[in-house]
Each structure stands twice: as C-alpha cells, then as structure tokens.
Amino acid sequence: MSEPLLRVVNLEKKFPIQRGLLKRTVGQIHAVDGISFDIAAGETLGLVGESGCGKSTTARLILRLLDPTAGEIYFNGKEIHTLSREEIRKERKDMQIVFQDPYASLNPRMTVRQIVAEPLIVHGLAKDDSDPAVDEMIELCGLSREFGNRYPHEFSGGQRQRVGIARALVTRPKLVVLDEPVSALDVSVQAQILNLLDDLREKFGFSYLIVAHDLSVVSHISARVAVMYLGKIVEIGTREEIFENPQHPYTKALISAVPLANPKQERVRKTSRIVLTGDVPSPANPPSGCRFRTRCWKAQDVCATSEPQLLTIGKSQVACHFPEK
C-alpha cells in the first residue's frame, strides 16, 4: 500500500487557562486529544462534529498555523512540525485552505486577478497577475475572465467563494483544507460550490480535508468521514458505512438530525429522531472514560471508568463500549 499524502498520529493540542495579573496557569483546554487519521492522494475526508469539538483546531494544526502539544503530522512523507521556516514555506504551495467566510477572506482593495495571482507570486511561480494560469483558474472556477479586473464587493457570496477557491487551487496544491466552505452561503448556492470542488478534484487529483458541522455537506463529496466529539474521533469509516450503518450513538444522533428532502419520509422519521439532552461538557474538564457518556442513552458503569479505543467493526472504526449491532 502506498504512503498516504497526509498522516496524523496521536495529535494533541491543549490551550492553557491563565488567570490573574501574573497569568498563572490554572488548567488546560483539551481542544484536540490524541486523534489519528490519514488521507490518500486524491481522497476527500470529511471531519464533522458540533461546534467546539476541535475540528477547526485540527485543520489549523495540519496547516501549521498552530503548534501541537504532542503527536505527529506527516505530509508528503515529512513531519511538518520539525521543518524549518524555509522548508515549511516550500511545502505551503502544496497545502492550501478555502476559508468559511467569502466576505472577510478577500482583500477588498485587490482585484480578482490580483487575489488569485497572489499565491503564485508569493511562491515564485509567477511574476505578476498577467500569468495565463490566473485567468485559466478563474474560468475553471465558473467565472468569466472578464471579472478579473473587478473587486470583491461587486460579487455575490457564491461568486466570492469561487474566487477564494481559485486562489487556493491556482498553485495546484496536493492538499486543500476546506473550512466550512459553504456554511455562509445560501442553500441554493451550496450544491453548486460542492459540485465545483468535486469536479476540480477529479480533474486535478486534489486531496480535500473538509471541516463541517453539516453532515449533508460532508455526504455530498466525502469518500470517508471522521466524527469528532470533544477533541476525540469517535468513529471513522467510508461515507456509505457512516451514513447507512452508523456504529457510535453520537454518529447515529447526528445523522438522525439531517433533514430529508422528501416531506413524507421526514414526517415518518421525526418519530425516531434522536434528541440529545444536556450540554456538551467543558473541554477544560472532560468526563472520565467515554466523553459522550453524559449524553448517551446507552451509558453504563464501564463508560465512566474505561475510555473506549477505536476498534474496527466492518468497514468502520468506532470508539464505543456498546456499538450498534
């Protein structure tokens, strides 16, 4: 089996809690706590979970926008957090990101052509925004090259996100992190953007890590899905296995909340929808044992004393003492 493009091993990130004038450390926030996964070349992995589960922190660690507390991240066979500033600069052209907010992520004083050309210029791949690769990528992302001299405020949200996608893909990176790429867009535009991303992946062989809280978004383009809860991956598997045969109670609850397009099916399913009670525990003081046990209808004594490990069940890996049968 070939080496994966990205391999994450026992990754941890803890943020200190500091108080007082002397900034005394009184605790830690366990944002990411010992997660492992990999992404193959040309593959899309969806990372899903509720707000505060650590998925966006994971994305920032992978891009080396944050330094990990522990663990390793291998990209292109290199452990990125051991690379020098110059070495990581060379790798960055192969690691790009599409941001959540198409309004805030674009410089209002730059034209579309300048925005898309910027990564090429920074990495020494072009001298200015007249490079043919700029107009080519603008058109590949569904915009006319005539838009190149316009400014971001002249476009709709969906068009701005297309500009952001063109900027991220113009260097032909190997890995693209999609941080909630459609959550700020109208529902009518979301499918268009997701289809565009999938078409470009097939054309150029990009690998995607898509971070989202909406499972319907992840199911649209992901080959595999990892479900996070309170800093831990509780289940990871193929898209079909996760959505058709979820093993972890939390995964099952998330999927039961995804609305169906057919009104009749939606009315029938409402009777079996799983409603989680209680709030998500604080990452500064996570529960002992299984972190989901405080909201789980299957929890027993062993769940409080023993932390479940990821075990292979069928085509999935699940961390649960009492997985679905």
PLM regions and their residue ranges:
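Short catalytic/signature loops enriched in Gly
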Residues: S2-P4, Q18-K23, T238-K325
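Helix-to-loop junction immediately C-terminal to a conserved catalytic motif
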Residues: L63
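Conserved ABC transporter NBD signature motif
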Residues: G71-E79, E91
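Conserved ABC ATPase "signature" region
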Residues: E79, I121, D129-E146, I255-S256
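Conserved ABC ATPase signature
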Residues: Y151-F155, Q159
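A short, proline-enriched helix->beta-strand linker immediately N-terminal to the Walker B motif
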Residues: V170-K174
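P-loop NTP-binding/switch modules centered on Walker-like glycine-rich loops
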Residues: V177, P181, L185, V189-R267
